[in-house]
Amino acid sequence: MKQVIFVLLDRYADWEFAYLAPALRGEVAQGYQVRFASSDMLAKISIGGLTMRPQLTLDEIPEDAHALVLIGAAGSWREDPPERIAQLAHAFKDSGRVVGAICDAARWAGSVGLLNDVRHTLNDPHEMADFPGYTNAQGYLPEESVRDGNIVTANGNAPVAFAANVLRALEAAPEKAIQEYADFYTI
């Protein structure tokens, strides 16, 4: 089974993975295992009040996982998230594996230099000027979700487009199946 790891922080946005996780668990793709990781094993509570206990700590993420998906959270990506997440995200990117970041997680990815050589999108590109680690304003595209190779970003209003682009990056299913899934939730 190919593992896709979702990183959750406190006050995570429960809707931002609500389309991708089931798509990977058989709605669109076969052969994927979805797992949730965080800095510790304590329960995380979503913006909507959903309580989830991570299955893994960041240090337990398997080296052979196929993708790392960073889910937005109300304020948590702005409150000094663990350095281990940046290490993992760069390692996944450097080894050609898929990295997805949505909403404030995409902003954070830009702040740690993860988006400096790829086209990407964000909630608000203007606030990126505050981050010396971000040097790719010209790579910003005003779109719901952007895929550049194995890096996928999305603004917080685009969980369906984000799911479709992560599925494409993983080559998890034929394009027709991915597009039909996305269309079902957007048309």
Model-assigned labels for residue ranges:
Residues 17-22, 86:
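Short amphipathic alpha-helical segment that frequently serves as the phosphate-/nucleotide-binding helix
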